[in-house]
Amino acid sequence: MQADIVIVGGGSAGCVLAARLSEDPALQVVLVEAGQPSRNPWLRIPIGYFKTVGHPRHDWRFETDPEPDMAQRRLPWPRGRGPGGSSLINGMLYLRGHRADYDQWAALGNPGWDWDSVRPYFDRSQPAADGPLWVSELPRDALSDAFIAAAAHAGIAPTADFNGGDNSGAGYFRMTTRHGRRMDTGRAFLAPARGRPNLRVLSGAQATRVCFEGRRAVGVECVRDGKAERVSARHEVILSAGAIQSPQLLQLSGVGPAGLLGRLGLP
């Protein structure tokens, strides 16, 4: 199988990438996702993460290393599995980063990543700009209002918008919900794009290695239905497998600390 762009991981970012890149009909896009689509109603109900976190179909069920200050306990590290990734099982808070973080990225040599440059893309993703990601206001209540007032009394300023570039202070968050239902990125971004002839989604495909020619990534090997497959990329391979599995996949492909790879017998 061959495409112009191969995206590994259909999670919070991967679904957005697949939807946006396939807007160009000249690009052939393949999205490789280890999880399977699910009709589990708890994935749509906001309180449902109590049922889905820890479920082997929806959560990779990672654990931390033993914690020496907690009697060597291993703590759960939930990571979503399936189209939508961790946005399937997270707390649904919609919170953009702080202006200073983006401005620092630009100052380090990444033009176009400053806050004023990226903010239009945040705005574009929401319905006010014909975007697909619904964000809802939390209903106000007396107890939360009292908490905000108490924070102000303690010197913590109230804020009406955590997404305006300064997310310090006390106030009401926004939620990625619509009409009381969770809006994960699989539903918001990927589902409307799946009918495009230039987008193919490989569900149940576990990526095992990035293929290289010299220093250039040219494809991905994966296992689907117990069979090994290779998806070749004419232009780019994009790793979007999350904070744990993107570096893991690089290490399985021979990219990482030489000492670690040597101990594991990885070339």
Can you annotate each of these PLM segments?
Residues 1-121, 262-263, 267:
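N-terminal glycine-rich phosphate/pyrophosphate-binding loop and immediately adjacent elements
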Residues 106-217, 223:
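Conserved redox-cofactor binding core of oxidoreductases
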Residues 19, 23, 195, 251:
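Short, well-ordered alpha-helices that flank and scaffold nucleotide-derived cofactor binding pockets
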Residues 24-30, 35-38, 210-213, 220-267:
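Glycine-rich loop(s) and the adjacent beta-strand/alpha-helix scaffold that form part
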Residues 11-16, 142, 243-244:
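Residue-level detector of alpha-helix initiation sites
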